[in-house]
Amino acid sequence: MDTEEIKEEMQEAAEAAIENAVETAELETAAIKAEGAAAAAEQSAEQAAVMAATLAASVEANAAQQIAEHSEQVQTQEEKISWLENQVMAMASNLQMMQEAVTALTVSQSLTPEPSPVPAVEVEAMPEAVTVEILPESAGDQQEAEPVPSVGDQQETAPRKRFRAI
């Protein structure tokens, strides 16, 4: 083999080695890029997991707060309902006592005889004196007695008033 052929073969071998080196470099670059993409994907997945966990915790906390507020409102409503029930029970008890009193009064009135009418009584009213007339049982035997003032000697100044006893 002559030098030319050896040179050519060496050149071809060098070109093949260069091509292999380029291919190897490209493969290594692709591998590095793939590793980078995998690392980025892993990091993104981790970030997504952290965000999902944060979101889940936030949703859970919000739900717990809403449940607590709702429970508080329910308890307040139950207390109001209980208070209203107590008021209704007290009113029902009072109504029952009133009905019993009305029934007792009605029965009492139905058992009580009607009162007889009372005759009108004439009463003299004087501002500072009261006059009392004492009449004997048989007024025909004696003369009419003079009124005797019981307080002071004042004359009658007020008009007579009539009262009916009930």
Curated annotation (Swiss-Prot):
Keywords: Viral genome packaging, Viral release from host cell, Virion
Major localisation: virion
Region listing for Disordered, in residue ranges: 134-166
The keyword Zinc is annotated on this UniProt entry: no
Subcellular location: Virion
Subunit structure: Heterodimer of P6 and P9; further multimerizes as hexamers of heterodimers. Part of the dodecameric portal complex that is composed of the packaging efficiency factor P6, the DNA packaging ATPase P9, and the internal heterododecamer P20/P22 which spans the virion inner membrane.
Biological role: Together with the packaging ATPase P9, forms the external part of the portal vertex that is embeded in the capsid and which plays critical roles in genome packaging and genome ejection. Both proteins multimerize as a single ring-shaped heterdodecamer arranged around a central channel.
Annotated protein name in UniProt: Packaging efficiency factor P6
